């Protein structure tokens, strides 16, 4: 039996081609695309300006992907909501909805699990199950929009998974997300986080998208980075910085370096000096992250005073730096924690 095509992963031109092959006029594709990506309906049956016969034909030919909420947690501290969504094959992924003064932000997953093995991340503990499709990534956002009744203005691909390990689907997702015929979210309001698969980053640079690239650095020497991130066994920091220069040259977009502060591991004065030396030649921003403790690892978070002192040292040397605001700490807010607890139940 042939696998049905995933209709929500098609762009408008691809959808036109599909529907024309069924004998429909091009305007039908525009109508259907609006139902899927603007009105965010959950089934063909809700597309009321399409004939019942045509809707039945679509059901037979196409898969209509929707994620289903199985658990929702809300922070009593800041109103952050964490969603655990079930996929059509029974796998689960997590997403986070956060409220800021500038608007609502959603953090989505790009894979079921992760194979990158970063030592301070819960989402990698059980390895990689599979990649998410463009529609499964989109519907995390669509489902949260439906459930909260509020518009999403910013999207962060920083949940479970390594986006560059799912490159083709991520690229398709980004184009669908920012399409003027769909949600029309500005590329500048989209952030993609990566541990740094360098050939893929070069490819992404050549796309010249205006998204924000957030690169997980977390250490200032290859020796330290290898202890925290297995990807550092493949690519050196020198190679990483060269690709960052290329990315900026191609896109004109400042890189964000994510730097998780682990007590006694990468938060010393020497680490600060080395980070300054790495950052100065680049157009970049440093985002300091108080590491989230997970029970399977013995890493501890740097204390607040230490984090502030680290930040001050960078600022005094002209480095653009912030400390990430901790959201949802009372609801398994760290990446992968809610999914892991659900699977262990």
What label would you give each PLM region?
Residues 1-91, 245-253, 259-345:
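Auxiliary Fe-S-binding modules of radical SAM enzymes
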Residues 75, 109-110, 123, 193, ...:
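Short linear Ser/Thr-Pro motifs
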Residues 99-136:
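Canonical Radical SAM [4Fe-4S] cluster-binding loop centered on the CxxxCxxC motif
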Residues 92-97:
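A short loop-to-beta-strand scaffold at the N-terminal edge of the catalytic core in hydrolase folds
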Residues 124-154:
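Conserved alpha-helical substructure of the radical SAM core
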Residues 86, 98-99:
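Phospho-regulated, low-complexity intrinsically disordered regions of nuclear gene-regulatory
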Residues 145-154, 159-317:
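Conserved AdoMet/S-adenosylmethionine-binding subsite of the radical SAM
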